[in-house]
């Protein structure tokens, strides 16, 4: 039963208790006629009874009010109790229904990371590790280009690839787009272990592109 329905029932009970008819044996006592000679006014009429008036009407009214208040409090608490009474198995099933969506989202993010395009990657090295024949303790951040250029292929690249597979072209090898530097870092200056000054130009990538 909804809250408003219960309130309506309570109001009907309250109205019934307040409008309860007088018990049998009750009648109005008519006031005596006005005595003009003495100048007295009419005496207000009062209730009289052949039997004693029951004393339980105030108690009945209090019982109705207590019932209304208890019903309203019970209805206010009922939504919280229903939520608390939700079986643990139902809550676990709802959590399990939400978890596959999260796992699928993580899988898609992982696939995007694997299939990334041409990007710039950095690694910390010693100049000697470059394999250029320098003996030095100088260090640098070497940046290089890595990744696939399939997403950057144009219609021209696709046509060349198809013609090369069908052997419609000459024996010349057709080049494909590669992930290459399109800009380089500033020159690197350093001293080797023999105190000889060296300069490395275009040694590290700054920006990458498919060319």
UniProtKB/Swiss-Prot annotation:
UniProt GO BP: branching involved in ureteric bud morphogenesis; cellular response to dexamethasone stimulus; commissural neuron axon guidance; dorsal spinal cord development; embryonic organ development; enteric nervous system development; glial cell-derived neurotrophic factor receptor signaling pathway; male gonad development
UniProt cross-references to Pfam families, sorted A to Z: TGF_beta
Residue span of region Disordered: 76-113
Induction: By melatonin.
Keywords assigned by UniProt, alphabetized: Cleavage on pair of basic residues, Disulfide bond, Glycoprotein, Growth factor, Secreted, Signal
Signal peptide span: 1-19
Subcellular localization(s) per the UniProt record: Secreted
InterPro entries named in the record: Cystine-knot_cytokine (IPR029034), GDNF (IPR016649), GDNF_fam (IPR043401), GDNF_TGF-b-like (IPR047020), TGF-b_C (IPR001839)
Gene3D superfamilies per record: Cystine-knot cytokines (2.10.90.10)
Disulfide bonding pattern of the chain: 118-179, 145-208, 149-210
Propeptide: 20-75
Record function comment: Neurotrophic factor that enhances survival and morphological differentiation of dopaminergic neurons and increases their high-affinity dopamine uptake. Acts by binding to its coreceptor, GFRA1, leading to autophosphorylation and activation of the RET receptor. May also modulate local neuronal effects in distal regions of the motor neuron. Involved in the development of the neural crest.
Family classification: Belongs to the TGF-beta family. GDNF subfamily.
Subunit structure: Homodimer; disulfide-linked. Interacts with GFRA1 coreceptor and RET: forms a 2:2:2 ternary complex composed of GDNF ligand, GFRA1 and RET receptor. Interacts (via propeptide) with SORL1 (via N-terminal ectodomain); this interaction affects GDNF-regulated, but not constitutive secretion. Also interacts with SORL1 in complex with GFRA1; this interaction leads to GDNF endocytosis and lysosomal degradation.
Official protein name in the record: Glial cell line-derived neurotrophic factor
Gene source species: Rattus norvegicus
Taxon lineage: Eukaryota, Metazoa, Chordata, Craniata, Vertebrata
Name of the gene encoding the protein in the UniProt record: Gdnf
